[in-house]
UniProtKB/Swiss-Prot annotation:
CDD domains: Complex1_LYR_SDHAF3_LYRM10. Plays an essential role in the assembly of succinate dehydrogenase (SDH), an enzyme complex (also referred to as respiratory complex II) that is a component of both the tricarboxylic acid (TCA) cycle and the mitochondrial electron transport chain, and which couples the oxidation of succinate to fumarate with the reduction of ubiquinone (coenzyme Q) to ubiquinol. Promotes maturation of the iron-sulfur protein subunit of the SDH catalytic dimer, protecting it from the deleterious effects of oxidants. May act together with SDHAF1. InterPro entries: SDHAF3/Sdh7. It comes from Nematostella vectensis (Starlet sea anemone). This is Succinate dehydrogenase assembly factor 3, mitochondrial. The gene is acn9. Transmembrane segments: none annotated. Belongs to the complex I LYR family. SDHAF3 subfamily.
C-alpha cells in the first residue's frame, strides 16, 4: 500500500531539513534536529490549511539554510524576525520561540569557563 502524495512530500521535506542540518555546527545541528522532529510530530494531525502553511514555512526555512550553508560566509546563520511576524504569533508560538532562543544561546558546557 502506498502512502498518500502529501505524506511523501512531508517526509521528503523532513529528510531535506535533516540533511541540511548535517552541514551546521554540531550544537546547532542537534538543536535543529530536535526542533524539527518535535514540530513535524506536533503537526501530524494538522488541518489541511495548517498543513499547507506548515509546509510553506518549512520550505522557506530549508531554502534559507541551504543558501546560508552554501555561501562563503559560514558564520552567518539564521535570520532576523520582522516585528509584524513576531506580533502575529500566538502565545504558544511565542513560548516556543523563547525556549528555542534560550537553547540556542545557552553556553556550551564542554568549554572551560573562567572562574
Amino acid at each position: 500500500m502506498s502512502l498518500p502524495r502529501h505524506t511523501l512530500a512531508i517526509q521528503a521535506l523532513y529528510r531535506r531539513v535533516l540533511k541540511l542540518h548535517r552541514k551546521l555546527p554540531l550544537e546547532i545541528k542537534a538543536l535543529g534536529d530536535q526542533y524539527a522532529k518535535d514540530e513535524f510530530r506536533r503537526h501530524k494531525k494538522a488541518s489541511q490549511e495548517q498543513a499547507v502553511r506548515f509546509m510553506q514555512e518549512w520550505k522557506i526555512y530549508a531554502d534559507t539554510i541551504e543558501q546560508q550553508v552554501n555561501s562563503q560566509q559560514l558564520n552567518v546563520l539564521g535570520k532576523d524576525l520582522k516585528d509584524e511576524h513576531i506580533e502575529s504569533l500566538t502565545e504558544e508560538q511565542l513560548g516556543q520561540l523563547y525556549s528555542l532562543q534560550e537553547a540556542a544561546l545557552k553556553p556550551d558546557s564542554s568549554e572551560p569557563r573562567d572562574i
